[in-house]
């Protein structure tokens, strides 16, 4: 799935939610992973599904139909604690569902926890490297109230630190 297909799928989900819920309520969904990077225009590779970290309970029954994966909530501790403070609205006119992505820096932190090849490749894309706010990323990794506060195990946090320091050493532009 590429960006246009992804936006179309989100639009269709919103339309179905509008048919199912004929009141004034609005729902929310936070998109992470490769789909979020597509929506942030920082990768161009296709992605198979949409990973949602959070979605309003009422719409969760619709998500499977649109191949939206909520199983990533098991990895919530791979995101910095104050993720919600940095959500990026998806530019899509909707009637029922407000879509957001995690910030690029929050996604990079989550992918630095991962050992999967596709996650590593995602954060090495030239678009990601050019768009990262390295000061924000550094804050998310080292601040006691961010990645460390949400880490499930100290050993995993130490692994994140190691991966981040290697990533920073190799890819952060000089002078930053």
PLM-predicted stretches and their roles:
Residues 1-176:
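Compositionally biased terminal segments of proteins
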């Amino acid at each position: 799935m590429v960006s246009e297909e992804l936006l179309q799928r989100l639009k269709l989900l919103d339309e179905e939610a509008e048919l199912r819920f004929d009141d004034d309520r609005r729902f929310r969904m936070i998109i992470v992973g490769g789909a979020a990077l597509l929506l942030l225009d920082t990768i161009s590779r296709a992605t198979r599904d949409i990973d949602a970290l959070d979605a309003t309970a009422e719409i969760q029954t619709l998500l499977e139909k649109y191949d939206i994966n909520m199983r990533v909530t098991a990895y919530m501790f791979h995101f910095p604690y104050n993720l919600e403070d940095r959500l990026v609205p998806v530019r899509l006119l909707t009637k029922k569902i407000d879509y957001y992505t995690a910030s690029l820096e929050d996604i990079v932190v989550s992918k630095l926890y991962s050992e999967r090849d596709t996650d590593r490749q995602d954060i090495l894309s030239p678009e990601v490297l050019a768009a990262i706010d390295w000061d924000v990323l550094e804050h998310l990794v080292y601040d006691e109230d961010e990645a460390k506060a949400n880490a499930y195990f100290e050993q995993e946090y130490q692994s994140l630190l190691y991966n981040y320091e290697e990533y920073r050493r190799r890819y952060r532009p000089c002078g930053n």
